[in-house]
Amino acid sequence: MLPSLQESLDGDEKELESSEEGGSAEERRLEPPPSSHYCLYSFRGSRLTQNRGDSDDGRSGGINAETPSGDDFSLSLVDTNLPSEVEPELRSFIAKRLSKGAVFEGLGNVASVELRIPGYRVGCYYCLFQQEKLLPEIAAMESEHNPSEYVVCFLGGSEKGLELFRLELDKYIQGLKNNMNCEERSLGNDVKSYLNSWYEDVVCPIQRVVLLFQEKLTFLLHAALSYTPVEFKESDEKTKRDINRFLSVASLQGLIHEGTMTSLCMAMTEEQHKSVIIDCSGPQPQFHNAGSNRFCEDWMQAFLHGAEAGNPFLFRQVLENFKLKAIQDTNNLKRFIRQAEMNHYALFKCYMFLKNCGSGDILLKIVKVEHEEMPEAKSVVAVLEEFMREALV
């Protein structure tokens, strides 16, 4: 296994468990059951005053969130699956956050909330959003001059765990807005089902993919790392959606130069095996044209180790560590290549690094694309390619 991989995994598992337990012995005694909840509130307040001038200290002004008070502020429950004795505590927590003016439309926040009954700390994602089309029961309460605003809260896991999914939850809110725009009468079953499914739709896909593929997960990791296109045969929509979500999170998109990513995708598509085929027609999915390497095999074992804990948030943390290690190895190889342009010993270090890192096949393709327009580095990459081919003979 790669150096420090097991230590990294164990550390993340303990940290996630510690954050969910709350840290102290008293908080660990009040550990939450494995459940998730939601709350949807309508919000009316004087917090959308635009200030486009400059502030006193010379900085450009943005949204000036005034502190709501009295008749200018209301937070009304629209729908929830929280126990009735707990919801007022959550509402009080959200009201305090709104009053501080640190909540911006469409950008979610994650915090840890301690609920007195049944008595545990839980991660809470909350997001303010505007709705173009009012639900009838809300429209009667709203002023003509005040746009309808809602606050949605998702509760589950820990603050650290939910933070890993904050961007996905922001996108999920956009889907909620679209569903609510389609409602003609009161809050319909589609919206309630959407709210109730947030945990399964956002948090659990990575876990489902790991449990589905087991040891074959190495092929999916390799495809994500190498930007190899993936096609499906006789797969249901939910499985396809889960796999695509996994590939999206596992790829290095956004972590390496966009031009490099585009060129690498084109290079991989032009190779003999254009796409990895996942055949779901049988009882177990089968891969065709799939590749693997020692790096992906080692990280596959890390995912299987995480499966024993049964914590869906842990899989996302392992996936983030997988990408971090890949980026670190890529940057190390680039540094060695720069040194090798003037130093033959550094060239040998490049070769030994590629041979031992476990993902030399992919790293070499990444740096080859990046150094295509740099003659000296390009010649170093060509020598390394020859060394690697000879090593395979």
Curated annotation (Swiss-Prot):
Keywords: Phosphoprotein. Residues 1-74 are annotated as: Disordered. It holds the Pfam family Njmu-R1. One of its GO terms (biological process) is vesicle tethering to Golgi. Residues 9-24 have a biased composition (Acidic residues). InterPro entries: Njmu-R1. May have a role in spermatogenesis. This is Protein Njmu-R1.
